Amino acid sequence: MALTADVKDELTKVEVSKTTVRAAELATILRFSGGLHLIGGRIAVESELDTPELARRVRKDLAELYGVRGVVSVISTSGVRRASQYLVRVLDGGETLARQTGLLDAHRRPIRGLPNRLTTGSREELAAVWRGAFLASGSLTDPGRSAALEVTCPGNEAAMALVGAAGRIGVAAKAREVRGVHRVVIRDGEAISAMLVQMGAAQTVSNWEELRQRREVRATANRLVNFDDANLRRSAQAAVAACARVERALEILGDDIPEHLQYAGRLRLAHRDASLDELGHYADPPMTKDAVAGRIRRLLAMADKRASDLGVPSTEASLPADFDEV
């Protein structure tokens, strides 16, 4: 997940001056990375994050935007966790914070999706929503067939809200559920680049695009190699078949063969691996590949007719048993 770490590292360093944009990012991080909990009868806001840098960013925004103190603690690795997590918790003033960020509605009920003011905000605020969601629970895979920018969501409503936010900034995203886990996915390469730019990961976009182009060049080269290999196999198989049929034709006709047809047949047998174009160059005087093909075709037709008259096997009877018609 090196790319994911690169994106998150870059996004953590994005500097935002507008209060509404900072608030949109923070509210989304809180929604996608934790939630509301009752501790001693009081509502606490918790956020479980990947890096100490992001934990510091969240703590700073909590203090500067809402005047509350976030307590940071480290959740050590375990059998399930492969890396330490950083828990930011606000207990004193937690309910007020939950209301101010939109995590609680007017009736003290936890919201199911995202606060309406976030999903209907400005383009900059919508980009901040996506930045917050990615910082909280996003991932970016290497470019290729399975390339994807993906965000794990706390529920279907949150996933649909994120899809809507992407659409409003011109990026197509899809929500999907796998074994009860809701995700929003962007798969198109251009769309992934566009979203990374919107979120503020310009350097990662450059690296990702370079990697994507290298993969595309390699894939194209592989397709061409496979195409060439297939063509070479077909050409080789056709040459083997032609030589086998020509040998049988000369055997059937004996000396009763027009000289120009016999010459074409002998030419084919003398240069078994050559293409029709190359056979034409070997001829004396030179011939076009169509002329060579035409003479060989007439030679085989004459031999097959003679074989039919005599009641003996035709030229096709000489084809190898494992010959594949192409």
Curated annotation (Swiss-Prot):
Q: Any idea which UniProt keywords this protein has?
A: Cell cycle, Cell division, DNA-binding
Its ancestry begins with: Bacteria, Bacillati, Actinomycetota, Actinomycetes, Micrococcales
What Gene Ontology biological process does one annotation of this record name? cell division
Q: Write out the function statement from the record.
A: Involved in cell division and chromosome segregation.
Q: Which family does it belong to?
A: Belongs to the WhiA family.
Task: Give TM regions.
Answer: none
| Keyword DNA-binding recorded | yes
Residue ranges of DNA binding: 275-308
Q: Name one GO molecular function term.
A: DNA binding
Keyword Membrane: yes or no? no
For this entry, the protein name equals: Probable cell division protein WhiA
